[in-house]
Amino acid sequence: AMFAPFQLAGIVAISGYVYFFEEWKKSLKPSAFQTPWLITHGLEDDLLPVVTTRNQVQKLKDVGLPITWKEFMKDHEIDLHVETSFIRKWVRSKMVRTRRPTYLPPDQTSSSNSKQRFKSF
């Protein structure tokens, strides 16, 4: 997302880390500064300590990336109740209604499962 030549709708990163290379700041594309980010992490994560990721997120914020940072009382996992609810609300808040066609997966009960369907908003 930081190096994509086009703007993404948003980024959700869960219990991860950022690999910083020597020239990473100079390689950022302008679109990276327009892409909203949500980064979540567990306070009890023993695999990737929260302090490390918290410091990495601060580096990203310091260069101006629009990041929402959220810590949860969890290990290196996805909290299926509190965290997914928070993510769902964040994604919905970033969605923009457009007139562009959006792919919808085929209805599993439909006989036309192999056909792609599109919906315009």
Where are these regions (language model features)?
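Short glycine-enriched nucleophile-adjacent loop
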Residues: 1-5
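The feature captures the conserved acid-bearing segment of alpha/beta-hydrolase catalytic domains
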Residues: 10-96
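Catalytic active-site module of serine/aspartate enzymes centered on a nucleophile-bearing elbow/loop
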Residues: 82-121
